């Protein structure tokens, strides 16, 4: 019995560690990276801006398009752990979850029909984060609920003001301030190039369902 409880605790801790790591990266991207950010702005800031204005847009991406960078990170993690003899099941689980963090995120923006019965069931019983929970991240001022795998960590981190505290610390110590998010009401307008990604344009090209089919389809949901 003790062994079973120990394994369960290790499994849960690994899941939450992976979710926290993915949430931490998500926070960094949302708070500080924009399309004009040197080197990574085009690859990280631009897609992030699109996502905050048009959350449903990410659902048209394939698994590889959504996850290639995380897969490379996970591969490096596994290779590093293997090279020093520390490649345990915990590392494998962490790597698999981290590599698929954007896929979990994508499920929260898809309809139940798009997700299918299994994913929808896991969301219904709260083993996976629900769309309703993630919708809080897309509610102005869009500065909370960065973790996207379960419903567990966000209430804890946000109650502790974990992200606010880190932003305050970075501003006070190195002068790094959170960047404005043009998808937040009153902080726009967004960049002109966003027009080509609007839901109206997407429907014209038969790329996305109508707004009524998703809780998070509105640009400022």
Model-flagged regions — what are they?
Residues 2-8, 24-40, 51-64, 97-221:
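Cytosolic/stromal cytosol-facing helical appendages immediately following the last transmembrane segment
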Residues 64-82:
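Core segments of transmembrane alpha-helices
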């Amino acid at each position: 019995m003790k062994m079973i409880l120990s394994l369960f605790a290790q499994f849960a801790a690994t899941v939450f560690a992976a979710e926290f790591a993915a949430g931490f990266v998500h926070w960094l991207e949302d708070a500080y990276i924009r399309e004009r950010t040197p080197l990574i702005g085009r690859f990280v800031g631009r897609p992030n801006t699109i996502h905050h204005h048009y959350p449903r847009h990410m659902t048209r991406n394939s698994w590889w398009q959504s996850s290639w960078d995380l897969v490379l990170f996970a591969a490096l993690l596994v290779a590093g752990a293997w090279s020093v003899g520390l490649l345990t099941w915990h590392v494998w689980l962490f790597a698999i979850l981290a590599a698929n963090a954007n896929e979990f995120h994508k499920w929260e923006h898809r309809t139940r029909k798009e997700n299918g019965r299994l994913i929808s069931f896991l969301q219904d019983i709260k083993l996976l984060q629900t769309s309703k929970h993630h919708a809080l991240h897309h509610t102005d001022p869009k500065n909370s609920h960065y973790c996207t795998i379960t419903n567990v960590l966000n209430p804890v981190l946000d109650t502790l003001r974990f992200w606010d505290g880190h932003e305050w610390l970075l501003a006070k110590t190195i002068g790094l301030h959170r960047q404005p998010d043009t998808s937040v009401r009153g902080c726009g307008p967004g960049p002109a190039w966003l027009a080509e990604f609007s839901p109206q344009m997407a429907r014209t090209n038969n790329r996305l369902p109508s707004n009524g089919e998703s809780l998070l389809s509105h640009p400022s949901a």
